[in-house]
Structures are given as structure tokens and as C-alpha cells.
Regions:
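S-adenosyl-L-methionine-dependent methyltransferase catalytic core, i.e., the SAM/SAH-binding region
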Residues: 1-310
């Protein structure tokens, strides 16, 4: 296994996928291929479909997964389109799906991608380098009201108005071109008490901009609305999230499919059309253990939710 990349909650994911040697499985967020490698290694006549919006990830994971031959198919695409991708491949149903949400460790570590507030780089933050919208566009072109909204909603940043105002004033002088230029602007907007906090002052703002650039929350909603329909009865859905916004969407998506009919009890016939299609395997999210946290501090905020198709 690549020492530079440790798959989060690997044992828990593999255990909960209930992998059959002849099954069909989807890794909707391929990344470096760590989860996929373990899934593919348990297949004999089965198939793994690996999806990622990042072409760099497809290339790297492709090399890692090459020994598995035609047991693995890799697709450049967005996990939000998992159901459509499976349709395009002629696959009617699968036995398990795994989604590891958010930015990947390699994306954070590759300075030139512009995800990190610790190193200077062009403002980019695109998970898919072929997409049009970048962090530069958001920071330099979006109106102050939208900047404030995403800081509040996606970053849960209490100083959102001050930061949005500072960005607009700074870009009026000249465009904000790099990550550390943006960090300086954010710092200038925050009170001294906030700058003394343990958390980096730019963390929430960078999260908000990254989520906006990649439309991450809408992607999770769309995936939860459509992907579970491609599971066979007994198939498992495993979703790893890293912050409360993602986890809330996943939790709500599972709950909606668990409850089935929403018609009033006194209604003679169902008119809502909802039927129960999932059941939670664990009521509470599965968290990393002490041993994993010691080996991989980046796993500290990870939560795994598992549901089964019924």
C-alpha cells in the first residue's frame, strides 16, 4: 500500500461492503485507489467500476490497479452521475457502492492545485481540471453577497461578512491571484482573538470556496437521490464524509429512503409513491479507531454511514 496515502476507514468499508467474489462494485471517488485495490483483490469473476472527476487520479490509480486486469474499469466522471455512468456501461444493478467525499490527500499535497492555505499557489481548487469555474473566478468575480453566503453556508464561518467585504475591497485594487494572497486578505478581516485560535484562520473560508468551485454539496445530494436505485437487494452503500454539511445530506438521504410512505395514516390508499428502499446498517456513524487516528490524523473527522438496499 502507498505509504503516502492511507485510505480512511479501510477495514470498516471492506467489512461493511460484504464483498462477493463475483459481485459488481463501484468506487465513486477513486482517488489514489486504496479502497479500490482492496475491493478488487477480493474479486475473482466480479467487476470494480472506479470513478473520479480528477484525471490525475485516474492515471495514478490506473497504474496501481493494473494487476487486476479487466476486473477493473476506470471512468473519468463525477460521482454525482454514478447511476448514469452505470447505465452507459450497460450495468443494471451493483452489489455495493463506496463514496469517500471531499478533497483527497493528494489534491491537498499537490501545491500547484491551490487547495492548501499553507503553501503559495495559483487560486484554482478544481477537482476536475477540465471544468471551467476555478477559485480565482469565485474570489475575483462573485458578488459580495454570494461570497458572504458561501462563507456562512459552506464554511460555517462566523466572520463571513467581514471576510467577504475584505475580499471585495482587495480585488478592487488588483485581482487576488494566489492562495497566500487570499490568506493575507482573510487574516486582515479577522479580529485578533480569532487569529489566536488553534484553527488556521483561513480554513473555513478555503473550505467554502472549494465546495463552491466543485459544487460538492449538490453532488452529494444528487448521488444520494439516484445512486442507491442501482443497488441490488442486499447491496450496500458506504459513504464517508468529513464535515457536518456532507454528513447531514447523507444521513437525510438514507432516512428519506428508510421511511417509505409519507401519507397520513387515515389515507385509504398511498398517493405519495414513496416506498422504503434502504435500511441503516448502523444507527450511528462509524468513526475511526484510536489506532487509525495515530497512523492517519487526517481521518479524525471522518464518519462512515452504511445502508443496505431492501
Amino acid at each position: 500500500m502507498d505509504a503516502g496515502h492511507i485510505p480512511v476507514l479501510l477495514h470498516e468499508c471492506i467489512e461493511n461492503l460484504n464483498i462477493r467474489p463475483d459481485g459488481i462494485y463501484v468506487d465513486g471517488t477513486l482517488g489514489m485507489g486504496g479502497h479500490s485495490e482492496q475491493i478488487a483483490g477480493r474479486l475473482t469473476t466480479g467487476t470494480l467500476i472506479g470513478i473520479d472527476r480528477d484525471e490525475t487520479a485516474i492515471v495514478r490509480a490506473g497504474a496501481r490497479l493494473a494487476p487486476f486486469g479487466d476486473r477493473v474499469q476506470l471512468v473519468h466522471g463525477n460521482f454525482r452521475d454514478t447511476a448514469a455512468i452505470l447505465d452507459r456501461l450497460g450495468i443494471g444493478a451493483v452489489d455495493g457502492m463506496l463514496f469517500d467525499l471531499g478533497v483527497s490527500s493528494p489534491q491537498l499535497d499537490e501545491t500547484q492545485r491551490g487547495f492548501s492555505y499553507m503553501h503559495d499557489a495559483p487560486l484554482d481548487m478544481r477537482m476536475d481540471a477540465t471544468s471551467g469555474l476555478s477559485a480565482w473566478n469565485v474570489v475575483n468575480e462573485w458578488p459580495e453577497s454570494e461570497l458572504k453566503r458561501i462563507m456562512y453556508e459552506y464554511g460555517e464561518e462566523r466572520y463571513a461578512p467581514r471576510i467577504a467585504g475584505a475580499i471585495v475591497r482587495a480585488r478592487a485594487q488588483q485581482p487576488i491571484a494566489t492562495t497566500l494572497e487570499l490568506v493575507d486578505v482573510i487574516r486582515s478581516a479577522m479580529p485578533g482573538a480569532a487569529l489566536r485560535e488553534k484553527q488556521h484562520p483561513a480554513k473555513r473560508s478555503f473550505q467554502a470556496i472549494r465546495i463552491a468551485v466543485n459544487d460538492e454539496l449538490a453532488a452529494v445530494r444528487e448521488m444520494m437521490d439516484t445512486a442507491p436505485d442501482k443497488l441490488r437487494v442486499g447491496g450496500r452503500l458506504c459513504v464517508i464524509s468529513f464535515h457536518s454539511l456532507e454528513d447531514r445530506i447523507v444521513k437525510t438521504g438514507i432516512a428519506r429512503r428508510e421511511h417509505g410512505c409519507t401519507c397520513p395514516r387515515e389515507a385509504p390508499v398511498c398517493t405519495c409513491g414513496f416506498v422504503q428502499t434502504l435500511r441503516s446498517v448502523s444507527r450511528k456513524p462509524i468513526l475511526p479507531g484510536k489506532e487509525e487516528l495515530e497512523c492517519n490524523p487526517r481521518a479524525r473527522s471522518a464518519k462512515l454511514r452504511v445502508a443496505e438496499r431492501i
